[in-house]
Amino acid sequence: MTRPVRTRFAPSPTGFIHLGNIRSALYPWAFARKMKGTFVLRIEDTDVERSSQEAVDAILDGMQWLGLDFDEGPIYQMQRMDRYREVIAQMLEKGLAYPCYMSAEELDALRERQREAGLKPRYDGTWRPEPGKVLPEPPAGVKPVLRFRNPLTGTVVWDDAVKGRVEISNEELDDLVIARPDGTPIYNFCVVVDDMDMGITHVIRGDDHVNNTPRQINILNALGGEPPVYAHLPTVLNEQGEKMSKRHGAMSVMAYRDAGFLPEAVVNYLARLGWSHGDAEIFSREQFVEWFDLEHLGKSPAQYDHSKLSWLNAHYIKEADNARLAELAKPFLAALGIDDAAIATGPALEAVVGLMKDRATTVKEIAEGATMFYRVPAPEADALAQHVTDVVRPALADLVAALKAADWTKEAVSAALKATLGTHKLKMPQLAMPVRLLVAGTTHTPSIDAVLVLFGRDVVVSRIEAALA
């Protein structure tokens, strides 16, 4: 194929978009970028009753968050109705399509008879014009559907980039309805016209569309178009081994952002969910684009693993710039009651984030850990009784004296802690736990010396002294 590469993502805006859906955007986006081609966003909104602007916004927001920029679009099918009707008129004129007056009840009865006879249920061509054939008289007042004249013989063949060579006999296909009685064109027809008009060269989509492909190829051939390269991606399964879907508990793409995942982690994870480059597990967006090809798309269903995504996210959090993480943490802090005014009263948020990120798997966890720096501690009475004992109080008093005199560095604070331990014959947990509790309000913190340095000398000394008073 010598045409410039043009790929597309063509979602239906009928619900939220999950990771399995957005993978069908990631791969054509990457292929277009790799081949210096064009990536088109098409919104297939012909299902008027189920489509919504809210769902469109979710698609756009998810793509923007993940950095899947498109070169053309969004193109809405509902805004192309005149073009579809124009093509239908041409097909009727050329005998490529015909009106069919068979009612839904008649079609159901036909299919039932076929099933009882052990045949594949299908339309039998009652209204299909043929030389010498006498058609029934059109029933009065009935608006027909329009059907495509599918070839009766021959085979539809395509070399799928994932599935290999696929051959479907035309005898297996009936005459597809391409327009409803009200004249509204249906999905399988609109897709063909769109792909032809938009010059799509590669269709990378889920394998739930495989059954549509031979019908679409036949229509495309009838219209004189050039079929694209097809790559049908195996299903994404959830952790229970079911097809990923909202009904089976899938999260929306934006729910991952709201849970504190970084977009680069999600992109990296999605890239590996059905494609591989050797043993590479962690790679940048730029590396992904450079390495991506259709030859290494997986042929088996890929199963979502939340722990693997969390592991990747933890890696990217550790690598992320502290200033960026601080900005990302602010909405989570706000949800926990820590606003900008509260942040201004405590240590620099960038420094806090830098301390917390090595222990976190999400930005939300960073924010949860950071709250101790911006709240007055309120340790539970049971915890105080357990850790701030009469044995420890003299050591706490000596530690305060040492901290007042020490340089306020991590090394100096660490030395003061160790000296106090030596003097009072204590082990680190015996001293660190009560100090954490009194200063931070919790016994769960990163390294105690680093935490104390961030709180600042005045806060540390005053909080321990208040407990000893």
From Swiss-Prot:
A single GO CC term, please?
cytosol
Report keywords, A-Z.
Aminoacyl-tRNA synthetase, ATP-binding, Cytoplasm, Ligase, Nucleotide-binding, Protein biosynthesis
The residue numbers the entry assigns to motif 'KMSKS' region are 243-247
Supply the enzyme class, top level: ligase
Record's InterPro entries?
Answer: aa-tRNA-synth_I_cd-bd, aa-tRNA-synth_I_codon-bd_sub2, aa-tRNA-synth_I_CS, aa_tRNA-synth_I_cd-bd_sf, Glu-tRNA-ligase_bac/mito, Glu-tRNA-synth_I_codon-bd_sub1, Glu/Gln-tRNA-synth, Glu/Gln-tRNA-synth_Ib_cat-dom
Reaction(s) catalysed (UniProt annotation): tRNA(Glu) + L-glutamate + ATP = L-glutamyl-tRNA(Glu) + AMP + diphosphate
Listed EC numbers: 6.1.1.17
Which top-level group of life is the source organism from? Bacteria
Which subcellular locations apply to this protein?
Answer: Cytoplasm
Q: Which family does it belong to?
A: Belongs to the class-I aminoacyl-tRNA synthetase family. Glutamate--tRNA ligase type 1 subfamily.
HAMAP family from the xrefs?
Glu_tRNA_synth_type1
How does it associate, per the subunit comment? Monomer.
Q: What is this protein called?
A: Glutamate--tRNA ligase
Q: Which organism is it from?
A: Burkholderia lata (strain ATCC 17760 / DSM 23089 / LMG 22485 / NCIMB 9086 / R18194 / 383)
